[in-house]
Amino acid sequence: MGTARWLALGSLFALAGLLEGRLVGEEEAGFGECDKFFYAGTPPAGLAADSHVKICQRAEGAERFATLYSTRDRIPVYSAFRAPRPAPGGAEQRWLVEPQIDDPNSNLEEAINEAEAITSVNSLGSKQALNTDYLDSDYQRGQLYPFSLSSDVQVATFTLTNSAPMTQSFQERWYVNLHSLMDRALTPQCGSGEDLYILTGTVPSDYRVKDKVAVPEFVWLAACCAVPGGGWAMGFVKHTRDSDIIEDVMVKDLQKLLPFNPQLFQNNCGETEQDTEKMKKILEVVNQIQDEERMVQSQKSSSPLSSTRSKRSTLLPPEASEGSSSFLGKLMGFIATPFIKLFQLIYYLVVAILKNIVYFLWCVTKQVINGIESCLYRLGSATISYFMAIGEELVSIPWKVLKVVAKVIRALLRILCCLLKAICRVLSIPVRVLVDVATFPVYTMGAIPIVCKDIALGLGGTVSLLFDTAFGTLGGLFQVVFSVCKRIGYKVTFDNSGEL
């Protein structure tokens, strides 16, 4: 077994070809030419630390993905990539190291294999994981950005800066989860996938492989679809315990689970314009993937072949487990074996039945919870709409009152304006006229006696005139009569006073 491991190690030390990776300096903003792998060209905020280095992973002279690497934990914090495509089969696995992580003064700017780095890099392995750290351990090099999702012939993903310790079973389930999510849930709901930004990362635990490389407590994935008018963002978490399945979370909730509470995507991947219908479709597929994973785990746990040798040995009688060669021991073992097999069969049947019952109850509970969540969501939406309508009316009341007050003030101003106009017109009349109008009653009252006097004098004169006229007329008549009488023989003399 040791020989096979050393042969495998020798095969991993093969020439890297055109594979390279550039260590981005602290003075450079972002990840340099690898900023294109981040939404809006902006790496996650809040993850900067002295022990973190930025790497622009390249292959064949082109950028492939970006990695933020922790020199303290010797595992990647996250890797960022876009639009994954299936990789060609038969590519050779060549695990490489980054020389400038351990030796900043190194002239080697490309990733090289560990065998070459031993003689050319000072303090190799002081800040990054090496292939030898994984030898004789229960862990394998698990890629955050899997080779199976890369179309690079030179396999840029086979760098130790893109790997973290994973058990074989967890690594297999993690890769299956990534393939299922990318092929069935994420890429189909993001157009052609060209606008799909992916972040995969780790959260280290306190346990370390050979007291050097931190084993992840859980791994996570965050996806941002930047399709105009139909974008979305989702997060996923998978704990390294064998019994755990991948969990879907909102990006905001995922950020709270990570150290330093970072912001993974600028403005949360256009949160205000996200397409909720596409997110619902993604969650439906994710639920199917989770159910499939539970089914696979249930089948594995119920299989007799999956039991360990230690569990089988505990069911054997002491004579058989000790390998007694006595006839009595063999006889007892022969007699006890059928009962032990029967007990094992009953045990596995009971366990399988219980697991299926629990799984059935879990499915029923999940459906009930989903129904309750749907009802609560609709009730909440209706309540919010109701209060929004009431709020709009309440908010509009002050505005309407202000409009009425404004109209009243406007009417009062019009009345005041009319009064001012009347006053101005009155004030524009000459003062003499106003005095005459004011003194008219006085003059009128003072002229009444004079007018009455004049009227009386006029009436007296008229009466006197009438009397004079009457007497003159009578005198004239008498004069005529006397004249006639004189002519006819009567002589009557009158003096001037009219006496006979």
Curated annotation (Swiss-Prot):
Q: Does the record carry Signal as a key word?
A: yes
Which key words tag this protein in UniProt? Acetylation, Endonuclease, Hydrolase, Immunity, Innate immunity, Nuclease, Secreted, Signal
State its Enzyme Commission number(s): 3.1.30.-
From the Swiss-Prot or TrEMBL record, state where the protein is found: Secreted
Q: Which GO terms describe its molecular function?
A: endonuclease activity; metal ion binding; nucleic acid binding
Principal EC category: hydrolase
Keyword match Secreted: yes
What's the subunit arrangement here? Answer: Interacts with RNF26; this interaction is important to modulate innate immune signaling through the cGAS-STING pathway.
Protein name, as recorded: Endonuclease domain-containing 1 protein
Organism of provenance: Homo sapiens (Human)
